[in-house]
Regions:
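Short boundary motifs at domain starts and secondary-structure transition points
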Residues: 1, 76-82, 293-295
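Short, well-ordered secondary-structure micro-motifs within conserved domains or adaptor modules
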Residues: 2, 15-53
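Alpha-helical hairpin
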Residues: 7-10, 37-39, 98, 141
Length: 626
């Protein structure tokens, strides 16, 4: 049994919890805090000295020691963190609201990796007194739940940071057709700047957050592209929208000051409003009046430069230079890709992390936030991007990935190479490594079998065996994945479906146009019922995965999507049966020529593409209509 000296009672209690994840042999470890290296471990023959600079770094040191002792008796390790703060932000606004138990599990793993901060992105998924439509049927956290999560983070000397929205990205709230909500709206998902009831709402946001001990908050304000162009324009006429942003920011910062908060905000809108073509990554000319405002505000807010796409250090460096025109107080947010369907993309996350880390170090950035977004339904599992999180931890503490696999196996029980096989549904054989967002995992699954509008973006002769092999690989890994086995079981079933579905629309059309009624009958009576059975099983596995990680709210969207898919397969069966029986003389859906879904990669020599909006994948008809 391992023996520690120099621990506080709280640290001893936390280490007991972490023994559920890692194991240490019978050794003696003398622990002390030091102002030298972030982590230092020395010793041999069962006697070790461990020092840490910041309290949260003790738990990474524990993991690093466990890894070293599994390989040998003599240990001499020193690590120096490049970043004062390393955070993970979980998206709890795209239907998947991390449940409290899973938040605690995530905190434990992050502690072992060396993270200082745990963040939850909550657009409307926290409760505000006097705002019943805010988070209505969305699984909004109560103040007590947030306090419980924060207390658990503090147990491991981690900071909890809420990430909210105080301008845009509030579509789930402002959609409600009641006066008390609509009077707050400018256009689309954007609040009406200058409306006093808007600032009452924002005061209520901070009143809820003030029940926490943390006094650090991200106030959002990103992607408000149409700010000032809806009701604001009708009420006030044309104004300089960069100045309008500054005016709103000042009001929000005043409210934050009232409650004692220091704010961060996503930085993109300043650049989009001041660049010639409205893009984030362009040179900007700052109008003088806006410059005066920014100079007054810049010491009150940290700008977060977010970028999840660049594959070269210089692209990041250029954007850092642009940011420094506005402020020197800059944090960086990179991405752990879990927002392109059911399947993560840890491979691309690794590629961009390597380049972003170089630029962050070169620009003396002191805070890095790794974001786990969940666009269009939060369908990717919360824990599927653990490799991406370990990658950023290694880059922070070591500036290399030489010990990535060893440290990851200590923390999860599985090699990082095996864990990253979760990506397989996105890793088609002919795809370049440096392209983001290509997501066959999603569009092959959701597209219709009679109206397969993405068929031009599939290459069945290579895709079908790829998915079949992926299903086998993932099933094998599941057997050794321990507490993470459910991730591999779900992905294995998904890949089995993709293998059967990727050529189905094409084969139906070929048989129909060839007059091959025997093949049509075989598909209608055997293959389609089998596919429905596979999808029903996947829905069951996915539901278990969702409920293990998240609150139940938001699962209804997946029920609707998969239920619709199943009904469309039934419709295909009946349409084909009617044709085969002579009840109809043609199948109109099969008479339509298939066109490219988009031309994003039209100049490339592969077929796959990006399609991440369910309502455009599932049908060419209109779902959102008046």
């Amino acid at each position: 049994m391992v023996t520690f000296t120099g621990l506080s009672p709280k640290q001893a209690q936390s280490i007991e919890v972490l023994k559920n994840h890692i194991s240490l042999p019978d050794v003696e470890v003398a622990v002390a805090q030091s102002d030298q290296a972030s982590i230092s471990i020395k010793g041999e023959k069962g006697q070790y000295q461990l020092t840490y600079r910041k309290p949260h770094q003790l738990y990474r040191a524990l993991s690093v020691l466990a890894t070293a002792l599994a390989e040998g008796d003599k240990v001499e390790i020193e690590e120096q963190a490049a970043y004062e703060d390393l955070a993970y932000m979980a998206d709890c606004s795209r239907n998947a609201v991390l449940n409290v138990a899973s938040a605690k599990q995530m905190i434990e793993v992050l502690a072992l990796m060396g993270y200082s901060t745990f963040e939850l992105y909550m657009e409307d998924t926290y409760q505000i007194e006097g705002q019943p439509y805010f988070g209505y049927f969305r699984g909004a956290y109560s103040a007590e739940e947030l306090q419980e999560i924060e207390a658990y983070a503090q147990q491991f000397d981690m900071t909890f940071v809420p990430c909210i929205q105080t301008l845009a990205h509030l579509s789930a709230f402002v959609k409600w057709g009641v006066k008390e909500v609509q009077q707050l709206r400018d256009v689309e998902d954007i609040l009406l700047i200058g409306e006093e009831k808007v600032y009452d709402l924002i005061d209520g946001m901070f009143a809820t957050l003030s029940k926490l001990q943390t006094r650090k908050v991200n106030i959002g304000m990103d992607e408000a592209h149409l700010v000032g162009l809806g009701r604001y324009l009708i009420l006030n006429g044309v104004v300089d929208r960069s100045l309008l942003m500054c005016q709103h920011l000042e009001r929000v910062l005043d409210i934050a000051d009232k409650y004692g908060f220091h704010c961060q905000m996503w930085s993109d809108m300043f650049f989009k409003l001041m660049s010639a073509d409205g893009q984030y990554d362009r040179e900007v000319e700052i109008p003088e009046e806006t410059r005066v405002y920014l100079d007054r505000l810049k010491d009150r807010v940290t700008l977060v430069y977010w970028d999840y796409y660049q594959d070269s250090e210089e692209k990041y460096n250029r954007n850092f230079r642009n940011h420094h025109k506005i402020s020197q107080d800059i944090a960086f947010a990179g991405g752990a890709w879990k927002w392109i369907g059911f399947t993560p993309h840890n491979h691309f996350s690794r590629l961009i992390a390597l380049e972003a880390n170089k630029a962050c170090r070169a620009n003396q950035i002191k805070e890095v936030i790794v974001t786990g977004w969940g666009d269009n339904g939060g369908e990717t599992a919360q824990f599927s991007i653990l490799p991406s999180l370990q990658i950023w931890a290694e880059l922070s503490y070591r500036n290399d990935l030489e010990r990535l696999s060893a440290h990851f196996k200590t923390n999860t029980g599985l090699s990082v190479e095996d864990f990253m096989q979760l990506d397989l549904a996105n890793l088609l054989p002919d795809l370049p490594d440096n392209l983001s967002g290509i997501n066959p995992n999603r569009y092959v699954f959701y597209q219709d079998v009679l109206c397969p509008i993405l068929d031009k973006h599939m290459t069945p002769e290579q895709d079908k065996p790829h998915f079949a092999k992926a299903a086998e690989i993932l099933s094998d890994i599941k057997e050794k994945a321990g507490v993470y086995a459910y991730l591999f079981e779900t992905q294995a079933q998904l890949n089995a479906i993709l293998s059967n579905k990727v050529d189905l629309g094409r084969r139906i059309r070929e048989a129909y146009h060839a007059g091959d009624k025997e093949s049509l009958q075989q598909i209608a009576q055997e293959e389609l019922p089998k596919l429905r059975s596979q999808i029903e099983h996947f829905h069951s596995l996915f539901s278990q995965q969702w409920l293990k990680e998240n609150k139940v709210f938001g699962l209804d969207t997946v029920d609707i999507r998969m239920g619709g898919l199943l009904q469309r397969i039934k419709r295909a069966e009946s349409r084909m049966e009617d044709y085969l029986s002579g009840s109809i003389t043609r199948i109109d859906e099969l008479e339509v020529e298939i066109l490219p879904f988009n031309d994003f990669y039209g100049d490339q020599d592969f077929a796959a593409t990006t399609a991440n909006q369910w309502h455009t994948i599932a049908t060419a008809s209109t779902i959102y209509t008046t």
